[in-house]
Design a protein with these regions (language model features):
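Active-site acidic carboxylates
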Residues: 1-105
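Alpha-helical scaffold elements lining the catalytic groove of polysaccharide deacetylases
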Residues: 104-116
């Protein structure tokens, strides 16, 4: 789901917390997962709570690949669209409905639809 924000809302935003790749496939399980990342989750939650309390914005960027993604020529198959790996970790899901959400099919967020 995406949060609908118009240009007036964007002009009122003073802070934007960008959350990148905190998905199950990088944090909890799968070929690209590194469970050590979990050690930053408590601080991440604190930052997200602070931003929400201030009425500021959160952007969530999720690694979400098509099954035939060219990236899989260089990296193991991971975070395929529609799988649990491509979902935000449970600890952060409560923010997803109120965030700007972008799904990227490459290593670069710049190629995510509607990002720029």
């Amino acid at each position: 789901m995406e949060r609908k924000i118009d240009m007036k809302d964007l002009e009122d935003i003073e802070q934007l917390l960008i959350n990148v790749d905190m998905v199950n496939g990088f944090v909890k399980h799968g070929a690209m997962a590194d469970e050590y990342i979990m050690h930053i989750v408590p601080e991440h939650l604190k930052l997200m709570n602070d931003i929400v309390k201030k009425g500021e914005a959160i952007a969530i960027i999720k690694d979400t690949h098509k099954e035939n993604c060219r990236e899989f020529d260089r990296f193991p198959t991971h975070c395929v669209e529609g799988t649990e790996e491509s979902e935000l970790i449970e600890e952060l899901k409560k923010y997803e409905n109120d965030a700007l959400v972008y799904c990227k099919n490459s290593t670069s967020t710049m190629y995510a639809p509607r990002f720029i």
